Amino acid sequence: GVATLNGADANHPLATYAFTTNPTAASAIGIAATDSDNSGVAGTAGAANIRSGRVRLSNAYGSELLDLPLDLRLQYWLSAAQGWQSNTLDTCTAIQASDFAFAFAGAGNNLSACETAMTIGGAAPNYTATLTRPGAGNAGWSDITLNLGAAAAGNRCTAVGAAGPAAATANAPWLQFNWTGA
């Protein structure tokens, strides 16, 4: 395809692309510049590989007496035969503990709001999200959501205590993935 960029549009710092198809292998996108009098560079001035990506946050369970690590991986789709792979070329996606929202169930759950707190270790593409141990008598569960969209939802627990302030967002919608397949 061909896209046209004129001088009035040249100040936009970021382009957003929506891939609505299933995960695909890397696609090379090239750029060829031609000015208004049609004198330009023959061929492409450069190309970049665009990949289908996602964040994978693993489930975990364990004792309320121990910290609970959850693997968090930045991945890209390589092929149908090789599936999702660690994206070692991603050195700039930043995930913070404040990007996670917590939801604590009521009935039958001994884990109250923010009796555990989230910390993040590691660096892209291999992070570890750790829930601090809530202590004896605080067995229970929490649903944890990593906010990747432009807007955040929920409350964070970055320190043990009462429910924390509103969660932030990593603002990386290109890493969202349809886990339910619907």
Segments and roles (model prediction):
Residues 1-182:
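Core sequence-specific DNA-binding domains of diverse transcription factors
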